[in-house]
């Protein structure tokens, strides 16, 4: 990925700006990504990946996971990562293998990691807590920065809107944060008519996200062919393609997000 598209979002004084670039094409071309400020000190630097689809038939999902862990640990060694997010579809219709994915691969990460279910994980709060120690919707507090994670699927793989009550309470809890990031496997908005079978239509969630000016971006997986950015109003929705599965972009990869001391956001 040699061409780097730039998207600039600026707002009121005191609001974070966001400089958005495509997701890292790390597996296809390790030289594709170059940090904007080498050796810079960041308030927070994290990686986000999705759609590993462990145990999908006719795929080498063990290789996909081992590659992801290798690349993330290398990135941490070279540039430092504060955390990693795996945004859904950790397994492919095999919730019984979530523990294996955790113990064999994710626990090998050199940094803390957080996960959220996707539609192929067939998981609810009880399943997720049994494996990862937290439920399928939760918040993470990183000082000036807050993360809101919510499940967007049921235990049969159906698509659902995020729990509105939880989202409302969580965003209100973080209303004094400088920056809030929202992590949802399935995007709660359909940009195109053809996406009725791909994303959910949750106008109340979109309105809620727009009502908090410190919500700076939403991150989604699910559509393996999307690596880039879409908007609802002025809110960026970022996609990171996939690191597993048998369809989507030709490359597999992940996204790096960097927040500077003055709350500039780059990815």
Protein language model features and the residues they cover:
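Metal-dependent catalytic neighborhoods of phosphoester/phosphodiester hydrolases
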Residues: 87-106, 123-133, 193-194, 227-233
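Active-site glycine-centered loops adjacent to acidic/histidine catalytic or metal-binding residues
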Residues: 51, 88-89, 118, 185, ...
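Beta-strand-turn-beta hairpins that frame and shape the catalytic cleft
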Residues: 37-47, 139-149, 175-179, 231-236
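N-terminal active-site segment of His-dependent metallophosphoesterases
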Residues: 21-99
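His/acidic metal-ligating clusters that form di-metal
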Residues: 71-83, 157-237, 265
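N-terminal secretory signal peptides and thylakoid transit peptides that target proteins
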Residues: 1-22
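Acidic/histidine-rich helix-loop elements
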Residues: 47-66, 92-93, 122-132, 155-160, ...
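Binuclear metal-dependent phosphoesterase catalytic core
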Residues: 33, 38-40, 49, 60-62, ...
């Amino acid at each position: 990925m040699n061409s780097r598209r730039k998207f600039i979002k600026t707002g009121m004084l005191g609001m974070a700006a966001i400089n958005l670039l495509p997701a890292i094409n790390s597996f296809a071309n390790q030289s594709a990504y170059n940090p904007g400020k080498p050796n810079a000190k960041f308030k927070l630097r994290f990686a986000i990946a999705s759609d590993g689809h462990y145990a999908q038939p006719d795929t080498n999902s063990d290789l996909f996971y081992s590659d992801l862990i290798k690349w993330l640990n290398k990135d941490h060694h070279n540039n430092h990562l504060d955390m990693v997010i795996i945004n859904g579809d950790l397994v492919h219709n095999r919730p019984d293998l979530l523990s294996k994915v955790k113990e064999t691969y994710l626990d090998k990460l050199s940094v803390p990691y957080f996960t959220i279910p996707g539609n192929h994980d067939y998981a609810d709060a009880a399943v997720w807590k049994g494996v990862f120690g937290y439920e399928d919707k939760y918040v993470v507090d990183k000082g000036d920065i807050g993360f809101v994670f919510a499940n967007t699927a049921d235990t049969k793989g159906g698509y659902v809107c995020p729990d509105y009550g939880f989202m409302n309470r969580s965003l209100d809890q973080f209303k004094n944060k400088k920056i809030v990031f929202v992590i949802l496997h399935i995007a709660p908005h359909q940009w195109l008519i053809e996406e009725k079978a791909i994303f959910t239509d949750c106008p109340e969630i979109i309105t809620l996200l727009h009502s908090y000016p410190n919500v700076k971006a939403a991150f989604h997986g699910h559509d393996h062919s999307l690596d880039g950015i879409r908007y609802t109003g002025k809110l960026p929705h970022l996609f990171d393609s996939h690191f597993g599965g048998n369809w989507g972009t030709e490359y597999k990869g992940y996204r790096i997000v960097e927040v500077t001391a003055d709350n500039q956001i780059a990815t």
